[in-house]
């Protein structure tokens, strides 16, 4: 599913991401835009460590989910990676909460550091009523 911007903003807010661990909704929206263009089905393979990034937040199979093909995977979210590709993003959000609970927080995502850090993020939620 490719979310419309305000639809995603409302969904993420409903699922409790706004302000979670001090991360604003606009930051999550920026992250989702740059990681997946709001597409729940996005996948990207990383040849270096043979891991794959899954879903709207591009959550990685080395640490966070099990895809049955990543060497030395940890599966800290205790889910199959396929759960991160569903139209219903409840489990993807739950896993993102787990990721951001680690010490580096939202800085765990390179796309956030490259595109969202120290930027004006208001356009990501403007006009959405959130």
From Swiss-Prot:
Keywords: Antimicrobial, Bacteriolytic enzyme, Disulfide bond, Glycosidase, Hydrolase, Secreted. It catalyses: Hydrolysis of (1->4)-beta-linkages between N-acetylmuramic acid and N-acetyl-D-glucosamine residues in a peptidoglycan and between N-acetyl-D-glucosamine residues in chitodextrins. Disulfide bonds join 6-128, 30-116, 65-81, 77-95. Its EC number is 3.2.1.17. SUPFAM superfamilies: Lysozyme-like (SSF53955). One of its GO terms (cellular component) is extracellular region. PANTHER family: LYSOZYME C. Lysozyme C is capable of both hydrolysis and transglycosylation; it also shows a slight esterase activity. It acts rapidly on both peptide-substituted and unsubstituted peptidoglycan, and slowly on chitin oligosaccharides. Belongs to the glycosyl hydrolase 22 family. This is Lysozyme C. It comes from Oryctolagus cuniculus (Rabbit). The gene is LYZ.
């Amino acid at each position: 599913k490719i979310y419309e911007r305000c639809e995603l903003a409302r969904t993420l807010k409903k699922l409790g991401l706004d302000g979670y661990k001090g991360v604003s909704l606009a930051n999550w929206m920026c992250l989702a835009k740059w990681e997946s263009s709001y597409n729940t089905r996005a996948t990207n393979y990383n040849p270096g460590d043979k891991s794959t990034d899954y879903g709207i937040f591009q959550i990685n199979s080395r640490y966070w989910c099990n895809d049955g093909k990543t060497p030395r995977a940890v599966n800290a979210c205790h889910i199959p990676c396929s759960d991160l590709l569903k139209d219903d993003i409840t489990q993807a959000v739950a896993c993102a909460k787990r990721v951001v609970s680690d010490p580096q927080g939202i800085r765990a995502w390179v796309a956030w550091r490259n595109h969202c850090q120290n930027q004006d993020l208001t356009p990501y939620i403007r006009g959405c009523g959130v």
